[in-house]
């Protein structure tokens, strides 16, 4: 049975993951840190994150949001790429190159590392570190 991880830090988050998910998320954590070392690791909204930017929430409050975040979901792992350019969300624009994954506007969902095209993910991460943001 899936049990959502509740944590107060990335270290706590990783420690609470089941072994199979922990291996995947630790790999992605290292991959992001290697390919975007300028994005400071953080822990926002119960997710390990990398880099952050300010945006106005629905109540017009100024919030910190991660540029990239990773999360263990019930049936897959999600990598959130909160980055845009004039054509919209970066993840969505690269969905055909990312491998055997499901892609939403800013979310890349996959079950195994082998499903990801790591070269394409690296490209998306490197664009994200230069263009963080959300389409509002």
Please state what every model-predicted region is.
Residues 1-136:
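Charge-dense, helix-prone N-terminal extensions
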């Amino acid at each position: 049975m899936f049990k959502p991880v509740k944590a107060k830090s990335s270290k706590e988050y990783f420690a609470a993951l089941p072994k199979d998910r922990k291996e995947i998320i630790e790999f992605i954590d290292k991959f992001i840190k290697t390919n975007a070392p300028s994005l400071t690791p953080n822990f926002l909204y119960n997710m390990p994150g990398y880099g952050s930017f300010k945006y106005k929430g629905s109540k017009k409050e100024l919030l910190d949001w991660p540029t990239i975040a990773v999360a263990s979901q019930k049936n897959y792992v999600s990598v959130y790429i909160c980055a845009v350019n004039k054509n919209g969300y970066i993840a969505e624009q690269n969905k055909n190159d990312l491998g055997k994954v499901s892609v939403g506007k800013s979310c890349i969902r996959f079950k195994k590392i082998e499903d990801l095209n790591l070269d394409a993910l690296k490209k998306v991460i490197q664009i994200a570190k230069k263009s963080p943001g959300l389409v509002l």
